[in-house]
């Protein structure tokens, strides 16, 4: 994982994301009034910048040069450099736990990522293309680890295949179990299994027994995990699926979609889902 401040990426986002200060708004308005054609052409640069930032050369650099020479840009750049170091410190401090998220929970090869760091005032996490994310979000002083959750949610969501609207809720719920619940629990040292999207809480409770099996938790350990996470179910009414621990996250999502009639049930009838 590389955290990078790139002038072209930074300027592009200052130009085309919401203005977070009056000074930036006025500068953008002046550029638009004076160099409208060049401004429009600059919009097309986004993907080119993210795909090859080191070798990117704009077709027309008028807009970029004006901002680079602006007296306030150096100050903005220093703020972003400082923010980048703050994010990197958080990432490096929790690197081992994050690596285990991918090796032990996701179990699927994920490409290397470059995180293009921009002004935190822009309030964005934008998955631009495979291997590239634009990050500009305030680090919550009360919950600084949340930014790691958001980065990894963005990466994983965009590296798991797409599903139809009805089945996509399983994808969202299971990725939340992986990141917002299990990964967050490891980061914080206490259970975070009651966190996440309110609309998915019910589905995640149905998935929870199978999630424990996917995690390789033995049936004898279920009770201690239920106590830890404050989620209960009747252990004896679930057939233990040994094959789940051999799957990756995408395969587990497929399994849950395929067997949803057994997983979501009003009465916990012991049945054997198809693997």
Label each region the model flagged.
Residues 141-150, 154, 173, 177:
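Active-site alpha-helix of zinc metalloproteases
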Residues 70-131, 186-193:
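Auxiliary, metal-adjacent structural segments of Zn-dependent hydrolase domains
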Residues 1-42, 160-229:
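Post-HExxH zinc-binding segment in Zn-dependent metallohydrolases
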Residues 43, 197-275:
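Pan-zinc metallopeptidase signature
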Residues 120-124, 140, 161, 182-185:
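Short, solvent-exposed loop/turn segments at secondary-structure junctions
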Residues 1-78, 82, 273-275:
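N-terminal low-structure segments adjacent to metalloprotease catalytic domains
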């Amino acid at each position: 994982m590389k955290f990078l401040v790139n002038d072209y990426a930074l300027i592009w986002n200052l130009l085309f994301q919401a203005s977070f200060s009056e000074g930036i708004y006025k500068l953008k308005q002046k550029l638009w009034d004076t160099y409208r054609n060049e401004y429009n052409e600059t919009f097309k640069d986004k993907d080119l910048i993210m795909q090859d930032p080191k070798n990117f050369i704009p077709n027309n650099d008028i807009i970029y040069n004006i901002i680079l020479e602006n007296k306030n840009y150096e100050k903005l750049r220093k703020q972003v450099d400082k923010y980048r170091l703050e994010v990197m410190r958080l990432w490096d401090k929790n690197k081992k736990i994050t690596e285990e998220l991918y090796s032990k929970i996701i179990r699927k090869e994920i490409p290397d990522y470059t995180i293009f760091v921009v002004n935190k005032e822009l309030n964005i996490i934008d998955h631009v293309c495979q291997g590239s994310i634009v990050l500009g979000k305030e680090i919550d002083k009360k919950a600084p680890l949340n930014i790691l959750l958001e980065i990894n949610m963005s990466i994983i969501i965009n590296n798991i295949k797409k599903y139809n609207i009805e089945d996509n809720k399983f994808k969202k719920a299971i990725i939340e179990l992986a990141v917002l619940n299990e990964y967050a629990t490891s980061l914080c040292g206490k259970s975070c299994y009651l966190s996440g999207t309110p609309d998915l809480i019910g589905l995640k409770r149905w998935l929870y027994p199978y999630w424990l099996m996917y995690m390789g938790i033995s049936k004898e350990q279920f009770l201690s995990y239920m106590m830890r996470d404050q989620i209960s179910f009747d252990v004896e009414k679930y057939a233990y699926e040994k094959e789940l621990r051999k799957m990756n996250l995408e395969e587990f999502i497929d399994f849950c979609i395929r067997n949803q009639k057994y997983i979501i049930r009003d009465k916990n009838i012991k049945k054997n889902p198809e693997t």
